[in-house]
Amino acid sequence: MNLSRDEFVHGSPLQARVDLREIRDEDLIVMVQNGQRKAFDELVARYKGRLFSFILRMVKDPTLAEELTQETLIRVYLHADKYREIARFSTWVFTIATNLVRNKMRQRSRRPLLLSLNPAPEDDEMPLDPPDLRQDPTEGIHREELAAIMAAATAKIPEKYRVPFLLREVEQLSYEEIQQVTGLKLGTVRSRINRARNRFRQAIKPMLRNETLLAELERIEARAAEEDNEDKD
């Protein structure tokens, strides 16, 4: 017997037979709204690592990143009833995380080594980790070394461009979703991502020493070219 979406999401004695790993994020949060704790546990399993990595790239403090990750997940649970499927669940989650980071940075604004998400001068730069590496390093270079090289390149991107860049290249959010997370105009989102890509290219090219780095650069350039062509159509 197959369960309908409404039967499963809103509760059924047969729901235990369904693997939560096969359920969409948006359906899981509806299950959380209906008091199903295991659905929340599945969302935590999916997002805790991503949130920690994303926040750590901004605050550069593992302890603080862990604290803000936990706070984000707590707010997801406590305010689950506020979610409506007018946006992807991931967009909602990263909006919560970004707002928490923004508030924390306001509180700690006198500490110059922490990234503030408030509007900043054009040349204000802060170090941030690079996009995730999906391929194993080759030609004798370790993953940690490769990550350090890409982190150095990403650190050359001013923070006002870096945040949209990471949301696009790391978290794979659409331009419209980044607009929702950051509160920027759509044209500004596109412009800042393009500028960030240019900064990344300029910074990474002198560091190219192996095929993995070259492949990462080519991936970003190909994606940028594809989006440019779409804009012209």
Locate predicted features.
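Arg/Lys-rich amphipathic alpha helix in sigma70-family domain 2
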Residues: L78-E85, T95-S116, R195, I204-P206
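Helix-turn-helix DNA-binding module
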Residues: A151-T188
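Structural recognition of an alpha-helix C-terminal capping motif at a helix-to-coil junction
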Residues: S53, E67-I74, A87-N99
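Short, charged helix-capping/linker segments at alpha-helix termini
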Residues: R17-V18, Q33-E42, F52-E71, L186
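Acidic, proline/glycine-rich intrinsically disordered inter-domain spacer in sigma factors
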Residues: P13-D19, I23, D123-A152, A224-D228
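Short amphipathic alpha-helical boundary/capping segments
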Residues: D27-M31, I149-P158, A203
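Short helix-capping/turn signature of helix-turn-helix
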Residues: R46-G49, R57-K60, L166-L173
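C-terminal edge and immediately downstream basic/flexible tail or linker adjoining helix-turn-helix-like DNA-binding
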Residues: N2-G11, P112-P119, I149-A152, L166, ...
